[in-house]
Amino acid sequence: MPRGTAQRGGLLAHLDRPKSRSRLRVREPRRLPRGLDRAETAALLGSFRSDRDRAIAGLMLFSGLRSAEVLALQVRDVDIPRRWVRVVGKGDKERTVPLDVDVAGLVQTYLLAERPESASTALFLVAKGSHRGQPLTPAGLRTVFRYHRAVAGVPAGHPHALRHSFGTALAEAGVDLAVLQALMGHDRVDSSAAYIHLAPTHVRASYDAARARQRADV
């Protein structure tokens, strides 16, 4: 047997076999969240008529709450005088977030004048109909936003769009990534970092500031 043939049967045998495809999976780029622009936000917020719905939208837009987090709020979770909200997020993880002063006023007015009398301790209740006084459900919240998207002419006006607008606004304001992660309730820092990509003006400002410091050190 020729020497070359013997070698191919041993160390070089792989040259005669078709290469199998690599089983490594390439991670697909993370889809960046879509927030609302100023006009869309104003139109959507302007369509709400009840203090309950305004407060719900405000908690999403100015405190970054998810739909499920809003619906899980209990009356005791909202500290209006100190303007804090206790939030139970994914995996039953708790965080405390600031309460915008205007949203605090909406919640207070809702509690005093609009919230139905009920044995339920849930913050947001059904306002009318046969389920009046019962906790607002995910289906009920979807109905509210579906109606107001149509009224406002803002097809992208979903609850998560308000939350994403909150995250984007923080990134544009230059909020520290760790603070952004804490406010948004993200388990992974890369989830928060996605908002930095949505704020190119902040990225450019940070870059220019860093370059200015470098030039000053030369």
What annotation goes with each model-predicted range?
Residues 1-218:
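Conserved catalytic core of the tyrosine transesterase superfamily
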